[in-house]
Each structure stands twice: as structure tokens, then as C-alpha cells.
Amino acid sequence: MPRRREVPKREILPDPKFGDVDLAKFMNVIMQGGKKAVAERIIYGALEQIEKKNPGKDPLEAFHMAIGNIKPMVEVKSRRVGGANYQVPVEVRPVRRMALAMRWLKEAAKKRGEKSMSLRLANELMEATEGRGGAMKKRDEVHRMAEANKAFSHFRF
């Protein structure tokens, strides 16, 4: 059933330390069970690790660069045409692009072998700035799928 009006977007307040909205959004992605203080500790710990490993480099800049590298441009969506399902490549909206990048970054960091989550996240962020790592692998996989199914792009939604 369609909605009568568009649902307003919730405004996310910037994080307390850096005053960055994207970092606050990522904090919400990392957070589990409403434990924001834990998520805060993980993220700020990761940014401190980045600063320690690369003195003089702004950790917030590294975070934005990593997210920018992970963002997917295209993805595939299933479309049923004449009894067959086709994987149709579609462009990703900017808001979804950001959400996917953050989700993939979190998942890739979780799967790493380091001792603490903040260390895992720091290393994943550093690798993403260099164009490597699990999150980048995921993005490349999605791009490859879209490229492989380019022939079905005329089935756009």
C-alpha cells in the first residue's frame, strides 16, 4: 500500500570529537544493541591507530578516502522478464552508495584476524585507502557482476 507522503529523513548529529556527520553515521553502523559508547571507543581507537602508524596524516581524511574508494558505482538487481530472472545492472543512489560502503567496511573489519575491533578497523581503513582489503574486494566483485551482466542493462527499472 503506497504511502500518502514521503517519510522525512532523520537528521544525524555530528560526532562529538571531529564534528563529522559521516563518522557519526558510521558509528551508528558499528553500534550493536544500542551501545554507542562501545562503538565510539572502537572508531576513535581505530583513528588513533591510523594517526600512530602515519604521523602527520589526518585520520579523518583517511576515513573519507577509504569510504570514497569503497563506494560502489553500479550494482545488479534481479528483474523477472518472461519467466526468467535477469541480473540487471543499475546505478547506485548516493545515499545507498554510502550505506553499502559503511556496511562492507564493517563486515570486512569483522572478518579480519587482529586482536581488537579497533585494530581490525584501522587496518581495513588503511588498506582501503590504498585500494586493497576485504571491503575493496567486495566492491570489485559487485562491479564485476554488473560488468558481466551489461547485456541486460536495457531491462532497467
UniProtKB/Swiss-Prot annotation:
Transmembrane segments: none
CDD domains for the chain: uS7_Bacteria (cd14869)
Cross-referenced PROSITE patterns: RIBOSOMAL_S7
Keywords: Ribonucleoprotein, Ribosomal protein, RNA-binding, rRNA-binding, tRNA-binding
A family per Pfam: Ribosomal_S7
Top-level taxon: Bacteria
GO cellular component: small ribosomal subunit
Biological process per Gene Ontology, one example term: translation
SUPFAM superfamilies xref list: Ribosomal protein S7
GO MF annotation terms: rRNA binding; structural constituent of ribosome; tRNA binding
Family affiliation: Belongs to the universal ribosomal protein uS7 family.
General function of this protein: One of the primary rRNA binding proteins, it binds directly to 16S rRNA where it nucleates assembly of the head domain of the 30S subunit. Is located at the subunit interface close to the decoding center, probably blocks exit of the E-site tRNA.
PANTHER family in the record: RIBOSOMAL PROTEIN S7
Subunit composition and interactions: Part of the 30S ribosomal subunit. Contacts proteins S9 and S11.
Protein's UniProt name: Small ribosomal subunit protein uS7
Organism of origin: Polaromonas naphthalenivorans (strain CJ2)
Gene: rpsG
